[in-house]
Regions:
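A broadly tuned preference for mixed-charge, low-complexity surface segments
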Residues: 69, 99-114, 183-191, 206-210
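Glycine-rich, aromatic-bearing surface loops/beta-hairpins
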Residues: 146-210
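Regular secondary-structure segments
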Residues: 46-64, 133, 137-144, 160-167
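Short, structured coil/loop segments at alpha-helix boundaries
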Residues: 42, 64, 68, 115-129, ...
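Generic structural signal of hydrophobic/aromatic residues within well-ordered alpha-helices
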Residues: 32, 36, 71, 89, ...
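N-terminal topogenic membrane-targeting module
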Residues: 26-97
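Interfacial alpha-helical end/capping and short helix-turn segments at domain and membrane boundaries
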Residues: 79-163
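N-terminal signal-anchor transmembrane alpha helix of single-pass membrane proteins
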Residues: 1-41
Length: 210
């Protein structure tokens, strides 16, 4: 029996659409990666973040009190440098063109959709970076007088949420959330619950679908 050419044509048509959408999705995402990379390139934010998080793990896992104090003493300069660099980055990011700074609140990346989405389904990543900069700086300064372990835990959450925003900007929310879980074994909701109250209020207000 001869194959149903109309059905085959339909499947080929669908396949062509899927391949085309995947191509344009990758191109859009690569443009985002390059754009963010230009603003991040003057800084060592990612390297300092990794150094700090690794340092916290070594500090918390050290049994010798003297050695533990020595490790903690070296982390203060990293915290301060990271907060200062991210604040400068957030200031630089204000120069990002407004249309390119818009991020879809939808979980999946849909090619060509971003310029067509209503404002309530978009947020401005420049505002998100400003929220993260304030949150990181506030925890580093520790005006609330948190205990060292509580402060380290909260600062770690602030940094992970900031990293999630960077991935969301470049790859979409679903990919950012999956990366957070895969790399740090931490759900997005848990990170949001662990940042400072001010960061959480500002962040949730920004990403809410109003």
């Amino acid at each position: 029996m001869a194959p149903d050419t109309s059905l085959m044509d339909f499947f080929l048509f669908v396949l062509a659409i899927v391949v085309g959408l995947q191509f344009f999705k990758r191109r859009e995402q690569q443009q985002r990666v390059q754009l963010l990379g230009r603003f991040l390139s003057p800084y060592q934010i990612e390297q300092q973040m990794e150094r700090l998080l690794d340092g916290y793990l070594r500090w918390l896992g050290e049994d010798d009190p003297i050695r533990r104090d020595q490790i903690y003493g070296t982390l203060g300069t990293v915290e301060t440098a990271l907060a200062e660099q991210f604040e400068r980055f957030a200031t630089d990011a204000k120069a990002m063109p407004a249309p390119l700074a818009q991020v879809s609140k939808l979980p999946l990346w849909i090619p060509f959709a971003q310029p067509l989405l209503p404002g309530r389904l978009l947020f401005d990543v420049r505002q998100a970076f400003a929220i993260h900069a304030r949150g990181i700086d506030a925890v580093v300064r520790n005006e609330e007088g948190r205990a060292p372990k509580a402060r380290a835990y909260m600062l770690s959450a602030e940094l992970l949420l900031m990293q999630h925003t960077c991935h969301w900007f470049c790859r979409g929310k679903a990919v950012a959330t999956a990366r957070l879980l895969a790399r740090h074994q931490t759900p997005h909701a848990q990170v949001v619950a662990s940042v400072s109250a001010q960061t959480r209020r500002d962040y949730l207000a920004l990403i809410a679908r109003r």
